[in-house]
Protein backbone atom coordinates (compact mmCIF):
# COMPACT_ATOMS: atom_id res chain seq x y z
CA UNK A 1 0.00 0.00 0.00
CA UNK A 2 1.30 3.47 -0.93
CA UNK A 3 1.91 5.93 1.91
CA UNK A 4 -0.63 8.73 2.42
CA UNK A 5 0.88 12.22 2.78
CA UNK A 6 -0.25 15.21 4.86
CA UNK A 7 1.29 18.67 4.53
CA UNK A 8 1.76 21.12 7.41
CA UNK A 9 2.92 24.66 6.66
CA UNK A 10 4.30 26.43 9.72
CA UNK A 11 4.85 30.17 9.29
CA UNK A 12 6.80 31.91 12.03
CA UNK A 13 8.06 35.46 12.53
CA UNK A 14 11.31 34.93 10.62
CA UNK A 15 10.84 31.77 8.55
CA UNK A 16 8.37 29.24 7.27
CA UNK A 17 8.60 25.54 6.56
CA UNK A 18 6.64 22.80 4.85
CA UNK A 19 6.60 19.53 6.77
CA UNK A 20 5.33 16.44 5.01
CA UNK A 21 4.03 13.61 7.20
CA UNK A 22 3.10 10.14 6.04
CA UNK A 23 1.74 6.96 7.51
CA UNK A 24 3.16 3.70 6.22
CA UNK A 25 2.49 0.36 7.91
CA UNK A 26 1.35 2.13 11.09
CA UNK A 27 4.52 4.23 11.34
CA UNK A 28 4.55 8.01 11.01
CA UNK A 29 7.43 9.73 9.28
CA UNK A 30 7.98 13.46 8.83
CA UNK A 31 10.32 15.41 6.60
CA UNK A 32 10.94 19.06 5.93
CA UNK A 33 10.50 19.56 2.19
CA UNK A 34 10.74 23.35 1.88
CA UNK A 35 11.91 26.30 4.00
CA UNK A 36 11.73 30.02 3.34
CA UNK A 37 12.57 33.35 4.98
CA UNK A 38 9.79 35.50 6.36
CA UNK A 39 10.00 39.10 7.42
CA UNK A 40 8.24 42.40 7.54
CA UNK A 41 8.16 45.24 5.05
CA UNK A 42 8.71 48.78 6.30
CA UNK A 43 6.17 51.07 4.62
CA UNK A 44 6.63 54.69 5.78
CA UNK A 45 7.32 53.53 9.32
CA UNK A 46 4.56 50.92 9.34
CA UNK A 47 5.54 47.29 9.65
CA UNK A 48 3.60 45.09 7.22
CA UNK A 49 3.57 41.37 6.54
CA UNK A 50 4.53 40.53 2.95
CA UNK A 51 1.41 38.48 2.23
CA UNK A 52 2.25 38.10 -1.47
CA UNK A 53 5.64 36.58 -0.62
CA UNK A 54 4.06 34.27 1.97
CA UNK A 55 1.50 33.05 -0.55
CA UNK A 56 4.18 32.55 -3.24
CA UNK A 57 6.29 30.51 -0.81
CA UNK A 58 3.31 28.36 0.17
CA UNK A 59 2.82 27.57 -3.53
CA UNK A 60 6.56 26.82 -3.98
CA UNK A 61 6.45 24.33 -1.12
CA UNK A 62 3.45 22.61 -2.70
CA UNK A 63 5.37 22.42 -5.99
CA UNK A 64 8.25 20.78 -4.10
CA UNK A 65 5.87 18.05 -2.89
CA UNK A 66 4.86 17.45 -6.50
CA UNK A 67 8.52 17.29 -7.60
CA UNK A 68 9.12 14.65 -4.93
CA UNK A 69 6.08 12.68 -6.09
CA UNK A 70 4.57 13.01 -2.62
CA UNK A 71 1.16 14.59 -3.13
CA UNK A 72 -0.59 15.37 0.17
CA UNK A 73 -4.25 14.46 0.65
CA UNK A 74 -4.67 17.41 3.02
CA UNK A 75 -2.88 20.56 4.06
CA UNK A 76 -2.89 22.80 7.13
CA UNK A 77 -1.33 26.23 7.62
CA UNK A 78 -0.28 27.53 11.04
CA UNK A 79 0.80 31.16 11.52
CA UNK A 80 1.44 33.56 14.32
CA UNK A 81 0.75 37.30 14.68
CA UNK A 82 -1.79 37.99 11.92
CA UNK A 83 -5.13 36.51 12.89
CA UNK A 84 -7.00 37.57 9.78
CA UNK A 85 -6.77 39.22 6.38
CA UNK A 86 -9.77 41.05 4.95
CA UNK A 87 -10.72 39.97 1.41
CA UNK A 88 -13.00 41.50 -1.20
CA UNK A 89 -15.59 39.66 -3.32
CA UNK A 90 -12.78 38.49 -5.63
CA UNK A 91 -10.70 37.05 -2.76
CA UNK A 92 -8.14 39.88 -3.01
CA UNK A 93 -6.63 41.53 0.08
CA UNK A 94 -8.30 44.73 1.19
CA UNK A 95 -5.56 47.03 2.39
CA UNK A 96 -2.33 46.16 4.13
CA UNK A 97 -1.70 43.46 6.70
CA UNK A 98 -0.12 45.23 9.65
CA UNK A 99 2.33 43.45 11.93
CA UNK A 100 1.46 45.36 15.07
CA UNK A 101 -0.40 44.57 18.26
CA UNK A 102 -3.16 47.17 17.96
CA UNK A 103 -4.95 45.44 15.06
CA UNK A 104 -7.06 43.57 17.63
CA UNK A 105 -9.02 46.82 18.02
CA UNK A 106 -10.39 46.49 14.46
CA UNK A 107 -12.68 43.60 15.33
Predicted regions and their residues:
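N-terminal glycine/serine-rich phosphate-binding loop of ATP-dependent small-molecule kinases
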Residues: 1-96
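Conserved small/polar residues in nucleotide/adenosyl-binding loops
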Residues: 103-107
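Acidic, proline/serine/threonine- and glycine-rich low-complexity intrinsically disordered segments
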Residues: 99-101
Amino acid sequence: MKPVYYLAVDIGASSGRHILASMDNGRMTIEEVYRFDNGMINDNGNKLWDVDSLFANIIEGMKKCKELGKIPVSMSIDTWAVDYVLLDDNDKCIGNVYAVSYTHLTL
